[in-house]
Design a protein with these regions (language model features):
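C-terminal accessory region of radical SAM enzymes
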Residues: 1-20, 51-94
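Radical SAM enzyme core and accessory elements
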Residues: 5, 45, 54-57, 85-143
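Histidine/acidic-rich helix-loop-helix segments that form or flank divalent-metal centers
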Residues: 25
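Short, small/polar residue-rich loop motifs at catalytic or cofactor-binding pockets
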Residues: 31-34
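Short, acidic, Ser/Thr-enriched surface-loop or helix-capping motifs
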Residues: 41
Length: 143
């Protein structure tokens, strides 16, 4: 397909190229931090993320709670703020500018200490092999 000039769209790679071009990634997983979302289930229950549709993260229910109440609970939960916690090793990694630590669900905290992304070694292997090519693609897109 690629050789016939019909390039596939692969969100993760498109976001990497965009990051290298100075754009903000559209995928929250590639931002390295969570955003404010309202995931609404069929029963009206609201959660901060589609990967955290769990009782402990339920912010309320649209049938019972106002948006103001739900937003207040989100702030009180510290859900988004917790996603800013990265290990010092992660922040110092040569690939942090493009990896950004990945999704919070892949680096859950243990106690007070931020967790390491369990795909970290894989990301390093990938970027060791592919970052030069991604940079070439980004440069060619900016021409």
């Amino acid at each position: 397909m690629y050789k016939r000039q019909k390039q596939p769209y692969i969100r993760q790679f498109e976001n990497y190229v965009g990051i290298l071009m100075g754009h903000y990634p559209e995928s929250c997983e590639q931002r390295g931090v969570c955003s404010f979302q309202n995931i609404v289930e069929a029963d009206g229950s609201v959660y901060p993320c589609d990967f955290y549709v769990l009782d402990q993260w339920r912010l309320g229910n649209l049938n019972e709670d106002s948006f103001e109440t739900i937003h207040k609970r989100r702030l009180e939960s510290g859900f988004v703020e917790a996603s800013y916690n990265h290990t010092e090793e992660c922040k110092g990694c040569r690939y942090f500018m493009i990896c950004r630590g990945g999704c919070r669900r892949h680096r859950e905290q243990t106690g007070d200490r931020p967790g390491e992304n369990h795909f970290c070694a894989s990301y390093r292997m990938f970027f060791d092999a592919c970052l030069p090519r991604l940079k070439d693609i980004a440069r060619s897109c900016m021409r």
